Amino acid sequence: MTSDVAVPAPETAAANGHGEAHTTAGFGALTLGSIGVVYGDIGTSPLYAFREAVTAASSGTDGLATPAAVLGVLSLILWALIVVVTLKYVVILLRADNNGEGGTLALMALAQRAVGTGGATIVLLGIISGALFYGDAVITPALSVLSAIEGMKDVTLRFEPYIVPLTVIILVGLFAVQSRGTARVAAFFGPIMCVWFAVIAVAAIHPIIAQPQVLFALNPLYAVSFMLHHGIIGFVTLGAVFLAVTGAEALYADLGHFGKRPIQTAWLFIVLPSLALNYLGQGALVLGDPGAIESPFFQLFPQGWIRGAMVVLATAATVIASQAVITGAYSLTRQAIQLGLLPRFEIRHTSEAHSGQIFIPRINQLLLVAVVLLVLLFRSSSALASAYGISVTGTMVVTAMMGFVVIWKVWRWSPLAAAALIAPFLFLDLTFLAANLLKVFEGGWVPLALGALMIILMYTWRRGSRLLFEKSRKLEFPLADLVAMLEKRPPQRVPGTAVFLTSDPLSAPTALMHSLKHYKVLHEKNVILTIETAQTPRIDPAERVRLEQISPTFSKVTLKFGFMESPNVPKALAIARKLGWQFDIMSTSFFLSRRALKPAAHSGMPRWQDRLFISLSRSANDATDYFQIPSGRVVEVGTQVTI
């Protein structure tokens, strides 16, 4: 998911389709930024992935980490990094951008636009993918920070009772500072993660030299042999192996911030080599001492202050990884709101320089509660690891499906060629998903439950909004008929301009009808204002405004925003002024209708879903704030509607 922490020159990244930097300095800054934001999640996987995978592989040998298990698991991890991350994401999906933006909802919008009418399946896939990300956003901070703090017991066992409380304190602190924005600290993310990758790579060199046979794991036949000879245990192990590639979606999700080339360069020349070396180093350590599987990552470092310093560095790296996921949840929520999948939650901008720097209080509160509950419920990274993976594999499956549509419809490949390209990756993703589903009763139910809840919320909001729109259109008066009637028999006029917000430009806005009914007057100039969300991330300012004069008294104004943008009505209307519309904010009143919803006997949805939709509607942020309209110029008209 997109991670809207402050990054170097995001405008440059998004401005030219694939975000290619034009200068060496700009390219270097974007590459460094991508290391800090994009690769935090996958970069901290060595803390637990190898340990959990070898432990699963050794379940048939009384917990003894045999050389066959170690080499087989290593080979699976290395080739998962090559096939899933390098080939699927770095080589293929980074090319499937939506005007420079990546991520599942951007891909959904691109695929939906390509399919045209009848894209309901695409929308459903997008809803599933977005919903599953929230499960990932809850588990990643809990698992990452907990696994880092657990390194304290490798320094001294006296720290063990304080692991969970300290983890909770760090997580509460992390969520508490979100409202202040990340601009000040984000500049350090890249350098800290660069140090992280350098240290974990260097620490692995000595064990590899001591146990050079670990390099046999580079041969994919060891992975194949392990799967063929270990039956169900091998299949279960795949679920743990997948932990090594969680975070791969971030490569695609953050495409708009950094561009294709910086993300590819960082992966191929820094992140992948460092991860491969570290996993090989952990494998070499366990080959020499099978007992080291208890904590192979931290045992790469000498006992004493060096290991203690590594715990501190690991904690910093996991906080950075958590930050990227948290801000990704904010970004996903904004996209979902703009695409009509969630109600208008309050969105605060935490930076004047970067429009992507946002904070959503409601999401922050819900994530904090869920993350802390997870830590208190599972209490160890090994237990939490069982809950991880399902949401990420589900997202990857959906991404592969929508990627097929884009390759077929947008790239204009034949269906057979598109299927031939995507089918191997989809098969691999489905295999990983099946392996992770075996962990449902061990904790995998958590992301499934969270995902199911979000799917219900998104589907209910989308369905309810559509039913409400259709019902309102039947009840409302056609705008063209009303204008013709008012031109023939005009009521008393008052000076100034009235702007009526409506989602249906063909019908007379409810606020206009109530104004005529109760006040018996009409402004000199009346504007029917409609705000549309495009299937592209951003809209060129030159295409933002569409004006249509429908009578001497009435005109239509349509403002179009991308799904990555925060609507700012006054700023957009300033563009309309340049196009010739005489607009003065001080003589303009904005009329909005506020609906009080009541459940109807036959609404088209079950009774419980009616009540859920009404509850979501009440939680929506005020339209005045969401569209950034000056509150002193707003007149709200209340209406009651049954759905």
Swiss-Prot record:
Recorded family membership: Belongs to the HAK/KUP transporter (TC 2.A.72) family.
Function: Transport of potassium into the cell. Likely operates as a K(+):H(+) symporter.
Topology term for the membrane: Multi-pass membrane protein
Full protein name: Probable potassium transport system protein Kup 2
GO molecular function per UniProt: potassium ion transmembrane transporter activity; symporter activity
Chain segments annotated as transmembrane: 23-43, 67-87, 119-139, 159-179, 185-205, 226-246, 267-287, 309-329, 358-378, 388-408, 415-435, 440-460
Highest taxon listed in the record's lineage: Bacteria
Phylogenetic placement of the source organism: Bacteria, Pseudomonadati, Pseudomonadota, Alphaproteobacteria, Hyphomicrobiales
Listed InterPro entries: K+_transporter (IPR003855), K_trans_C (IPR053952), K_trans_N (IPR053951), Kup (IPR023051)
Stretches assigned to coiled coil: none
Keyword annotations: Cell inner membrane, Cell membrane, Ion transport, Membrane, Potassium, Potassium transport, Symport, Transmembrane, Transmembrane helix, Transport
Annotated localization: Cell inner membrane
Predominant subcellular localization, coarse grouping: membrane
Keyword Iron recorded: no
GO cellular component, one term: membrane
Known catalytic reactions: K(+)(in) + H(+)(in) = K(+)(out) + H(+)(out)
GO biological-process terms attached to the record: potassium ion transport
